[in-house]
């Protein structure tokens, strides 16, 4: 029996989001052993329990108040939301924040030799999918009638097997579609992982812990999106150099020993630093350019 005074978080047991969710919790300082095949794991340093479940069970666990928080793909969350609304329910939850992993898209795909000029091509066609409600929502908006073929896996084989004329499935790189003689023709939904919270009153201790976790998650995500930059630059071109490296705050400028025409600059930049940016910095006279990863940060 779970202790209801502890914060309960549901995450995917295995699969696309599992590794990223585990890494996020670890970088937030939650010490927990998720290596063993346990469905429930307990944090060593915080009053937190982790429930490891199937991804399509997570939205329901949050909406039904079984757990306090859930890390889930927006596609799975939206599908469950539409499913419950179709049954006359009024599901409640809060999306606390979008996360920086789990990116994918839900797309329509057809066989390579099939012509496609728009959603109207699918009029009265049979479409295989694991996301019938998201598919219906999209095609209803396009005024397209279709027949749904519900499959919980291996959706890509449906056209070759004669089960469907087209499919609607998650796409990451498109390699699986290509291997099955299919091509992506329409993106109907773009998704990332998100953190959701159950509806209803939350005890003050739990809410304080949630707020602490959100602050840490923000720091982890911001650190991953930022770099620590160190370089030497000509004093007269400093403004041009800074303009290439947007940051949350002004940089730290330090004098260089024995050289009054140049300075050392340190800053946290939110700009992804490509080779082109470094080449532009060099063309402005910058030298000794170092780009370092940031493990954690807090503003």
From Swiss-Prot:
Entry keyword ATP-binding: yes
Known pathway: Amino-acid biosynthesis; L-histidine biosynthesis; L-histidine from 5-phospho-alpha-D-ribose 1-diphosphate: step 1/9
Enzyme superclass (EC): transferase
Main localization category: cytoplasm
GO BP, sorted A to Z: L-histidine biosynthetic process
Reactions the enzyme catalyzes: 1-(5-phospho-beta-D-ribosyl)-ATP + diphosphate = 5-phospho-alpha-D-ribose 1-diphosphate + ATP
Cofactor: Mg(2+)
NCBIfam families recorded: hisG, HisG_C-term
Protein purpose: Catalyzes the condensation of ATP and 5-phosphoribose 1-diphosphate to form N'-(5'-phosphoribosyl)-ATP (PR-ATP). Has a crucial role in the pathway because the rate of histidine biosynthesis seems to be controlled primarily by regulation of HisG enzymatic activity.
Protein name: ATP phosphoribosyltransferase
Biological source species: Pectobacterium atrosepticum (strain SCRI 1043 / ATCC BAA-672)
């Amino acid at each position: 029996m779970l202790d209801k005074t502890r914060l309960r978080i549901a995450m995917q047991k295995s699969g696309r989001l599992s590794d990223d969710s585990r890494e996020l919790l670890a970088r937030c300082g939650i010490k927990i052993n998720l290596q063993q095949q346990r469905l429930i794991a307990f944090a060593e340093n915080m009053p937190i329990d982790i429930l490891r479940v199937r991804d399509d069970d997570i939205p329901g666990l949050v909406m039904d108040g079984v757990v306090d928080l859930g890390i889930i793909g927006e596609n799975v969350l939206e599908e469950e939301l539409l499913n419950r609304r179709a049954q006359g329910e009024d599901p409640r939850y809060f999306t606390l924040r979008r996360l920086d992993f789990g990116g994918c898209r839900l797309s329509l795909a057809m066989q390579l030799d099939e012509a496609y000029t728009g959603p109207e091509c699918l009029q009265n066609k049979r479409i295989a999918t694991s996301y019938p409600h998201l598919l219906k929502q999209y095609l209803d908006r396009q005024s397209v009638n279709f027949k749904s073929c519900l499959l919980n896996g291996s959706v890509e084989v449906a056209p070759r097997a004669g089960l469907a004329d087209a499919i609607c499935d998650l796409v990451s790189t498109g390699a699986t579609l290509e291997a099955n003689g299919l091509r992506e023709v329409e993106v109907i939904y773009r998704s990332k992982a998100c953190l959701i919270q159950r509806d209803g009153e939350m005890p003050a201790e739990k809410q304080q812990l949630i707020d602490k976790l959100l602050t840490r998650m923000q720091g982890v995500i911001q650190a991953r999106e930022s770099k620590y930059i160190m370089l030497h630059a000509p004093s007269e071109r400093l403004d041009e150099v800074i303009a290439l490296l947007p940051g949350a705050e002004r940089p730290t400028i330090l004098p260089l020993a024995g050289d009054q025409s140049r300075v050392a600059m340190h800053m946290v930049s939110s700009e992804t630093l490509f080779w082109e940016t470094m080449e532009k910095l060099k063309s402005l006279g910058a030298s000794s350019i170092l780009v370092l990863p940031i493990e954690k940060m807090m503003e």
